[in-house]
Amino acid sequence: MISIRVSLLTVLLPATAIAQVAQPRVAGPPPYRGFAPGIDYRSFVERARSLADRDTLRCNTSRNTAQLIECGVAIRDPSDAARFYLSAHFVEGRADVVAFKDSAGFGRGDAPGTALVTRTKRDLTRIFGRPRPNGRSGWEWRYGRKAIRLSWRGRGTARWVAISLNDYDVMDRIGRYVKAAGSRKP
């Protein structure tokens, strides 16, 4: 009887030990201008207010639930005087998307819009390392279920850049509050 118990223990103990070993966590991305994917609402508000450039942080709560919030403000980062429109979307108090938007080069012949894109690419590469291409005018850095995305558009000398910090684990929770779109066919 004892030999059966011992043999069962020798078979089961390694299996339970393997089951208890946690999967290694992927390190999250470094923060960008003090913000990171999945940042909590309170930390976002504190940082956004400290960077607000003659603007008031505005937040709107969903009409259907208080668990969905959108915020936005014009900011100026004192470290390099960069200006952005900062916005974020929160699900259950955590940001699924934090976005920085900027533009340059309207009505000028010296192509400052091109310089904006070049400067933004250089800045993000310095922080996050080598990017993966994402389409014709986009880059991406992946950190498990979190990602940093840069996209840019242009017309003439004008350029628009958008940097988004995405947390897909938080984004998946939105399904609890938003119904799937129905069929559009009559």
PLM ranges: what are they?
Residues 72-92:
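Compositionally biased P/S/T/G-rich terminal and signal peptide-adjacent segments
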Residues 5, 24-27, 87:
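Short, functionally important structural connectors and interaction interfaces within domains
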Residues 11-19:
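Hydrophobic h-region of N-terminal signal peptides that target proteins for export
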Residues 1-8:
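Bacterial N-terminal signal peptides that target proteins for export
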Residues 20-70, 97-186:
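Non-cytosolic coordination micro-motifs
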